[in-house]
């Protein structure tokens, strides 16, 4: 990193608040020498977690005090109307006003999307932002899944826009031309799926600038046969949470199995580095951080129950996206694609 970069963190968001967000912020400052962080939240709580560990990083930390918090049970519209001094909203306003290049929050997903859409506005040609995150695959290449919960129900046009944005994002981040895009469906046959998925497929079939390959089923998500998988937020969120639960089960069973019997324990020590690598790849925390794409600013959503290491992943993602100026790059590519589609 060659120039200063400022992130705004919703320090009160998520299940653990400053107990997680503040230590993760300090770790990020350690890794990124030009990074500055604005912590938005209750100053007393934030300073309590900074007291014994901030040290040389204090000059790169700013606190904006507020005691108002968006709760996980708050309705998005109500939070938008009534919680105008919340830590989430103030963090987003810093991005809107150009005082920060990105915002990270582990708070209420619906409220975050509603506030971000109102404050940051969507890019030209985008009706709804979408949450997207990378997942591991059998090929070693990441797979992008969207939407992950920002839009519980979607029409065909929204799914089409998600496909375009996901394709552009993959190109920008991974410098890959024409990534393979698919719609998540209950079958691969062309006649399968509800009206929204069917109509989105027709739109994508007639779009040359998107490398649409057809439908994929749930068991193909992690094969790496496609790069971008599109679905509505209801399906995407359940898919993601189910996958995380299965990953945790597999890790737990593997650890339990390796502790049974003297010979197995001895063997496991010999191959410990390889086991650690496998477990790390399967750990959902390693992939924490979903990007709210389609906005004029950068917003990264962390899991609400993220621990320090997982939240740090979300902060690192925000740093990467800010360094690469993703909104500007997506805007340019998106305008080109939509212009070609509409011409």
Curated annotation (Swiss-Prot):
Enzyme class (EC, first level): transferase
Catalysed reaction equations from the record: a fatty acyl-[ACP] + phosphate = an acyl phosphate + holo-[ACP]
Gene3D superfamilies listed in its UniProt record: Isopropylmalate Dehydrogenase
Cellular compartment(s): Cytoplasm
Enzyme Commission identifier(s): 2.3.1.274
Keywords assigned: Cytoplasm, Lipid biosynthesis, Lipid metabolism, Phospholipid biosynthesis, Phospholipid metabolism, Transferase
Coiled-coil stretches noted in the UniProt entry, renumbered to this chain: none
Cellular compartments per GO CC: cytoplasm
SUPFAM superfamilies: Isocitrate/Isopropylmalate dehydrogenase-like
Pathway linked to the protein: Lipid metabolism; phospholipid metabolism
Subunit structure: Homodimer. Probably interacts with PlsY.
PANTHER family per UniProt: FATTY ACID/PHOSPHOLIPID SYNTHESIS PROTEIN PLSX (PTHR30100), PHOSPHATE ACYLTRANSFERASE (PTHR30100:SF1)
Protein family according to the UniProt entry: Belongs to the PlsX family.
HAMAP family reported for this sequence: PlsX
Protein known as: Phosphate acyltransferase
Species for this entry: Shewanella denitrificans (strain OS217 / ATCC BAA-1090 / DSM 15013)
């Amino acid at each position: 990193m060659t120039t200063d970069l400022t992130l705004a963190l919703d320090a009160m968001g998520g299940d653990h608040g400053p107990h997680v967000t503040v230590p993760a912020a300090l770790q990020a400052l350690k890794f990124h020498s030009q990074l500055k962080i604005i912590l938005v939240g209750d100053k007393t709580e934030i300073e309590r977690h900074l007291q014994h560990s901030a040290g040389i990083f204090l000059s790169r930390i700013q606190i904006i005090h507020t005691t108002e918090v968006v709760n996980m049970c708050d309705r998005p519209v109500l939070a938008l109307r009534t919680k105008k001094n919340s830590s989430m909203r103030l963090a987003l306003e810093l991005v809107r006003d150009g005082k920060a290049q990105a915002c990270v929050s582990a708070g209420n997903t619906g409220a975050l999307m509603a506030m971000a859409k109102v404050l940051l506005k969507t890019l030209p040609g985008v009706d709804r932002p979408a949450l997207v995150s990378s997942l591991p695959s059998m090929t070693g290449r990441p797979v992008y899944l969207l939407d992950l919960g920002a839009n519980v129900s979607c029409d065909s046009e929204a799914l089409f826009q998600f496909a375009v944005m996901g394709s552009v994002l993959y190109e920008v981040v991974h410098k890959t031309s024409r990534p393979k895009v698919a719609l998540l469906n209950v079958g691969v046959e062309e006649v399968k799926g509800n009206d929204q998925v069917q109509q989105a497929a027709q739109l994508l079939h007639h779009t040359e600038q998107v490398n649409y390959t057809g439908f994929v089923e749930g068991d193909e998500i992690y094969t790496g046969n496609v790069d971008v998988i599109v679905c509505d937020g209801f399906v995407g969120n359940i898919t993601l949470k189910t996958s995380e639960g299965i990953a945790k089960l597999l890790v737990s069973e593997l650890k339990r199995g390796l502790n049974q019997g003297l010979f197995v324990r001895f063997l496991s020590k010999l191959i410990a580095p390889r086991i650690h690598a496998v477990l790390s790849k399967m750990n959902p925390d390693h992939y924490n951080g979903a990007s709210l794409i389609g906005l004029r600013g950068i917003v990264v959503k962390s899991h609400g129950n993220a621990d320090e290491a997982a939240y740090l992943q979300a902060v690192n993602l925000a740093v990467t996206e800010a360094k690469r100026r993703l909104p500007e790059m997506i805007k340019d590519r998106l305008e080109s694609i939509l212009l070609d589609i509409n011409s």
